[in-house]
Amino acid sequence: MIYKLYFDGSCKYKNDGSCDMGMGAVVLDSRNNIVYEQGWNTPAYDHKDDNGILSNNVAEYQALFRGLDALSVKRPDGISELRIYGDSKLVIEQVQGNWKVKAAHLKKYRDSCVAQIKLYEKEGCKVSLEWIPREQNKPADRLAQNAADGMERHSNQLHDERD
């Protein structure tokens, strides 16, 4: 069976240089039914890059990692293919190995996501990643935005579409 994972990250910046970070992940089954969705937040998270500049990239990486992790914990039987979609070109290209990770603080996030993907592949699951425009990522974006505003969402348990 084919499953699709949509992820997104968001930061609501504050005057003190910190931000409220939100992450969202949505998993669809092969019939495009939502089988899992979740929004997570990390309030007042300071995630400056190597140049001391605030970046949204950590939130994007965290969203991908948490989505992969949640799916692996609640993994449905018979998942043969996982298609991953996100609107962060940087995260998609770096995880695929097409772009170098220039910011040292992002390398650990990229490595964690790649390790998760390799676990799926080791079990015979075909994994692909694709960049999509923000307009096609609205459910994950909405979860991330709401989580950054302090409204975490925990939804239905992941289940096999045969249930």
Mark where each language-model region is:
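RNase H catalytic domain
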Residues: 10-16, 65-154
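Intrinsically disordered, low-complexity regions of eukaryotic proteins
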Residues: 31, 62, 143, 162-163
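Short amphipathic alpha-helical face segments that pack within enzyme cores
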Residues: 58, 62-66
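Extended, charge-rich low-complexity interaction segments
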Residues: 155-163
